[in-house]
Each structure stands twice: as structure tokens, then as C-alpha cells.
Amino acid sequence: VGIWGWSGGGSNTLNALFRKPSDYHVGIAVVPKPQPHLYNAWFQEIYMGTRESNEAGYQQSAPINFAEGLKGKLLIVTGSGETNTHIQIIEGLVDRLIGLGKKFDYMVYPNRNHGLSEGAGTLVHVRMLIARYLLENLPPGPR
């Protein structure tokens, strides 16, 4: 089974791959939030309260805390100009995966923001990357 998502959906993709590796074999996380405590506090606190009032919730919702569970194929996609989920937040996950010796793929679009829509052809490139990754790593037909 393959899964992909953008933003919060990217975080759900990471959680699915990391926590249910026997169920999810391929995932594409586009501009995910792997460390919610570093994400925009005003947005995060609407749904989760403050970190001080809900430490357990923040720990349980943070994909980075479950990265050791990765067994399948993972593609992480972001933009270096990201102002929503800053690239440093995603690089924290990338660094953790490297430290765990996990194999994964990583695509950074230069100077692109959360929508990855800046620059001629970027969105087409992103969509083609997603399609190609799924086709190469999750081919159709019985196994």
C-alpha cells in the first residue's frame, strides 16, 4: 500500500510509514510537519493547546519520534524557501533518518514556499515526481 500527502497530510504519511510499516510500504511526504512543536505555534495551539499543557499530545503526534519504524520507501519533498514548515524542521527529520541509517529520498525545490508553486513548471515537476515515485516503487498488479 502506498500513501502520500501534503502539509498535514505529509505528516500523516510519515506517521503511517513509521508506525504501521507492515501496512504502508511507500510514502511521499510533501512539506510535512515532522516536529509539531517547532511549527507555527498559533496554528498548532488552536488544535492541540500549548506544548506545556499537552506535552504527551505533542510527543505522540510528532513523526520524528517514530522514525526508527521506517522500513518502506520514503520520499520527502520541500522547498528551501518554505515559510510555513521551515526547512530546518524537515532537516531535523532528515538528520534523524540519516542517524538511524534509514534509506530515503529527498527533493528540495530551490526558493519554493509551502505550495511549491513558484517558478515555471514547478507544480508539474512535483506532480510528475510523485507519479514516477509511486510507479517505480509501487507497481500495479499482483505480487
What are the language-model segments listed below?
Residues 1-143:
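Active-site-proximal cap/loop segments of hydrolase catalytic domains
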